[in-house]
Amino acid sequence: MSIETLLEAARFLEWQAQQQQRAREEQERLRLEQEREQEQKKANSLARLAHTLPVEEPRMEAPPLPLSPPAPPPAPPPPLATPAPLTVIPIPVVTNSPQPLPPPPPLPAAAQPLPLAPRQPALVGAPGLSIKEPAPLPSRPQVPTPAPLLPDSKATIPPNGSPKPLQPLPTPVLTIAPHPGVQPQLAPQQPPPPTLGTLKLAPAEEVKSSEQKKRPGGIGTREVHNKLEKNRRAHLKECFETLKRNIPNVDDKKTSNLSVLRTALRYIQSLKRKEKEYEHEMERLAREKIATQQRLAELKHELSQWMDVLEIDRVLRQTGQPEDDQASTSTASEGEDNIDEDMEEDRAGLGPPKLSHRPQPELLKSTLPPPSTTPAPLPPHPHPHPHSVALPPAHLPVQQQQPQQKTPLPAPPPPPAAPAQTLVPAPAHLVATAGGGSTVIAHTATTHASVIQTVNHVLQGPGGKHIAHIAPSAPSPAVQLAPATPPIGHITVHPATLNHVAHLGSQLPLYPQPVAVSHIAHTLSHQQVNGTAGLGPPATVMAKPAVGAQVVHHPQLVGQTVLNPVTMVTMPSFPVSTLKLA
């Protein structure tokens, strides 16, 4: 329930009180009117009983009265006895006045001579008539007092001076004169002779009473009012019942409307207080929500930054790993960071499973380093030029390679029992190539734990793109130039001497054209030379001499040897290599 409903209920109560007051006033008026009507009915009934028979006569005798002015002089003394009939005259007029009004106009002059004769012979009638000529004027105002005849009285009031409407009054006097007993009863009911002022006030009261009676509904307004009052009270009761149901903790014993309204006001005030509290709570929660959203955004931003860092680390690790695991033609970035030794050892440990994929040449070389056993796989690869052979020994464990290579170091070079078909041309290094250009990248191993990475970027035009890694070499270095056909090949051997390397070059497996191989050698006491086939005329040789410098002399090779940890030999046809110490 809202305040508007309570205000409406209060207005309704006020309106109800006003209606009750009006009803009381109206009942008083109706009671007074009923009393007046009863008095008038009594007077009318008495007049009718006394004058039922002579009512017809006045119509014939009414016109002669105005012609009686000559009669007053002979009867001056009897005016004292006549006043009694004067007071009685107006009462019968009230009932008979409507009847004589229409007839008087047609009978003014016709009866003038006739009634005068019979009136004069009357003994008592003549003087009575002469006195009543002036008397009817003051007695006439009493006619308007009765309420039921108000419309007729209005019509008769304006012609107060005319004698025609007043003519019927004297006729009853003649009939009442022989009955003096009735006159005293009627006289006390009549008020004193009215004056002109009372004549003016009486019509106004009659108009009001007539308007009240003429209103639509009349007496039926009371029934309508009662129905409306019942409906109003039923509606009000229903409203209070609804209010009771909506208000909690209402005491059933207190059934008064006032208590219900007070309880409703208190409940409304409590609801308003709760509403304000809830609004404050909503504002606080909104502020907390905004703060939480800001914090969440900050955490998301921080998380995205961490994800970026982790992604960068992952990419760096992937790019930093040697690309021997998967074949690709992509160019490595220059100046790339060195890889930790732990990662290198892990990579070295991955070598044995990969050896299983390359069955015959690699296994033979890992287990049987002497050259006498290696020529076995020659039959499967008889053709020299279409493919270049490469063996990735970097995958082999260091422990296996060390003992195997320490023993063959003093051994003499084995006889070239199985000369490779790729060794035929003389002008080439150790093995001639049919055609095409490439670069030669040499890898040497040493007992040093660290790794020196050399990144060599070569444009794809003359040859393939290769990444070379050079590590410090052992005391007995060896340099190998491996030939290949236009497809880029990678050759890895473990020779004790150059002849041994040349002899093994013909037995190495082949790689397809787009392959670029990079290796990191993890050996402590053996020599490793990795050669990548390239163009016939140009070649790049990288070596690390420890005890004595050794240079491979060839008419097509330009070499530089320096007693430094790293020796870089460049060819004029390729870009300069970049070396980094790990």
Curated annotation (Swiss-Prot):
GO terms for biological process: cellular senescence; negative regulation of apoptotic signaling pathway; negative regulation of transcription by RNA polymerase II; regulation of cell cycle; regulation of transcription by RNA polymerase II; transcription by RNA polymerase II. The modification N-acetylserine is found at residue 2. Keywords: Acetylation, DNA-binding, Nucleus, Repressor, Transcription, Transcription regulation. Residues 109-123, 387-408 have a biased composition (Low complexity). Residues 22-42, 203-214 have a biased composition (Basic and acidic residues). The keyword ATP-binding does not apply. It comes from the Eukaryota. Residues 18-224, 319-422 are annotated as: Disordered. One of its GO terms (molecular function) is RNA polymerase II transcription regulatory region sequence-specific DNA binding. Its main location: nucleus. Pfam families: HLH (PF00010). Residues 220-271 form the bHLH domain. Residues 61-82, 99-108, 135-149, 160-171, 368-381, 409-418 have a biased composition (Pro residues). One of its GO terms (cellular component) is nucleoplasm. Residues 271-299 are annotated as: Leucine-zipper. Residues 334-345 have a biased composition (Acidic residues). It is found in: Nucleus. InterPro entries: bHLH_dom, HLH_DNA-bd_sf. Efficient DNA binding requires dimerization with another bHLH protein. Binds DNA as a homodimer or a heterodimer with MAX. Binds DNA as a heterodimer with MAX and represses transcription. Binds to the canonical E box sequence 5'-CACGTG-3' and, with higher affinity, to 5'-CACGCG-3'. This is Max-binding protein MNT. It comes from Homo sapiens.
